[in-house]
Amino acid sequence: MQFKRFLALGDSMTEGMSDVVFNGKYRGWADRTAEVMAANWPDFTYANFAVRGKLVGQVVRDQIPMALPFIEGRSTLVSFHAGANDVIRPKYDPNKTIATYNEGVDILTRAGATLALFCVLEDTGAKTRAAKVWQERFAIFNENVRRRAASVG
């Protein structure tokens, strides 16, 4: 499918934090993907709304409303990655985080966009107590992402 537009929503993973620095700015996977798409598809447009450190509720509340006016059906690709910053918090509430994530997916699906959803690395290889807790949390979170991805195609 040829996309007319790519909208990137989320946190540091999508913003490009800690990726290649170009002219003093991060240039992450979303920027590089958009560059290739723009080179191959005429009249292609791109916007990256992602901001490092954002929680899933902030992405749903702040970024999705900004992106909605730019969605023009299935020809708009929207990447949605949020929730990892919630998962690593001491007072993580899996039910709330997953429900909010699902709300974001539902809003974007109703808008008619083609969605790209992403899982988080579950096992970093670290053997600390915190790493074990995060692995368990991310496994549950990722299972929800996989279910939602399957449900929206």
Name every feature range the model reports, one short phrase each.
Residues 1-52, 65-74:
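Serine-esterase "nucleophile elbow" of acetyl-processing enzymes
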Residues 54-64:
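Structural motif
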Residues 25-28, 57-58, 136:
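A short linear-motif detector with a strong N-terminal bias
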Residues 51-56, 85-86:
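Active-site neighborhood of divalent metal-dependent phosphoester/pyrophosphate hydrolases
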Residues 46, 57, 127-128:
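Generic signal for short, ordered secondary-structure residues
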Residues 41, 62-153:
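Alpha-helical cap/lid subdomain in secreted, periplasmic
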